[in-house]
Amino acid sequence: TQENFEHVLRHREPVCIVFSLRYFQETGILTQENFESIRLHKEPMYIKEVLSLLQKTGMLTQQNFESVLCQDATDIERFLSSLHKVEILTQKNFEHVRSHPDLKNISRILKFIQEAGILTQENFEHVLSEQEITPLKLSLYYLQEAGMLTQENFEHVLSEQEITPIALSLRYFQEAGM
């Protein structure tokens, strides 16, 4: 309609809207409601990236799109991108994280270990089973900053009963330049 066309023309990110529409069209879920969802979303660029990743992997469905809208767009994009880069983005893995109560920290952990070259299905499952997500994220962050995030150090951190002291010791070493 003329109204939809004008919405795209006046949108602050029209290219993101057009690409999102294309992904919807290609997967058969282009509806007025979905258009309104992306048009009104506060992060259209991240939504476009999420839709692109889901479309590339054959996972762009109405249900997955709706679950993405319930998440922070930057966190879900970071999560999907990390898994996609190492070819472990599957519907099962998406569902595991989609329902995780701490998507923000999980997505950051995945980004750290993906950038370190140690994101595997096994390591992904270890991260999901971890109870102390925030201390794990901090420990991995400090290891990454020090250039010490390796598979061996990742396993050492995971094997500790108390991760918080590990994170603190890494922070103190980093602050002291040691």
Where are these regions (language model features)?
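Ankyrin repeat (ANK) tandem alpha-helical domains that serve as protein-protein interaction scaffolds
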Residues: 1-178
